């Protein structure tokens, strides 16, 4: 019988994030501002803390993951990896197809991985309140939970139709200081 589910031990949670830019033969074009010119790190500082800007513009292959972030990741990571045997058979491919199931996170998606890191770096920079937008609610719920873990007040603006249709996103209600529906 072929193995389908693969579970790594907590000891194998990565210690560094991999930055794909380091290995790209053609580097991505710079992000452009409203004036059509590349945005400088100084311009990014209006909405990002310095440590996140440094990562955004870095060409280093490996970026260390702070231990407080790794400690929180241990609550649900490593996420299980599954082999898609039936999809392989349906496609008739000799390739092995795997997928990682991120639904084991408290927010139910991969978005909490980034939210935890962003909340951590903002707290380290002295930020005590953050505001974000969310469409269907997963990002807003993720940042709200991350903010709660790091003592940051979070205000979430949510698309009105999702706000009305997704009352089950209770984690946002429990961990977010303020949720605001868009007017349309």
Regions found by a protein language model. Name each.
Residues 1-179:
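PLP-dependent amino-acid enzyme catalytic core
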């Amino acid at each position: 019988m072929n193995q389908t589910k693969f579970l790594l031990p907590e000891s194998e949670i990565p210690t560094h994030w991999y930055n794909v830019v380091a290995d790209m033969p053609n580097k991505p074009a710079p992000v452009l501002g409203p004036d059509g010119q590349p945005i400088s790190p100084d311009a990014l500082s209006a909405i990002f803390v310095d440590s996140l800007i440094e990562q955004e513009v870095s060409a280093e292959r490996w970026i260390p993951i702070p231990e407080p972030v790794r400690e929180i990741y241990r609550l649900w990571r490593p996420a299980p990896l599954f082999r898609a045997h039936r999809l392989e058979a349906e496609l008739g491919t000799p390739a092995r197809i795997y997928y990682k199931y991120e639904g084991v996170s408290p927010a139910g998606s991969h978005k909490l991985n980034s939210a935890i890191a962003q909340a951590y770096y903002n707290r380290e920079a002295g930020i005590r309140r953050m505001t974000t937008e969310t469409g269907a609610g997963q990002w807003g719920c993720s940042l709200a939970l991350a903010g709660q873990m790091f003592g940051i007040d979070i205000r979430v603006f949510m698309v009105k139709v999702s706000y009305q249709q997704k009352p089950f996103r209770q984690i946002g209600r429990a961990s977010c200081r303020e949720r605001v529906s868009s007017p349309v």
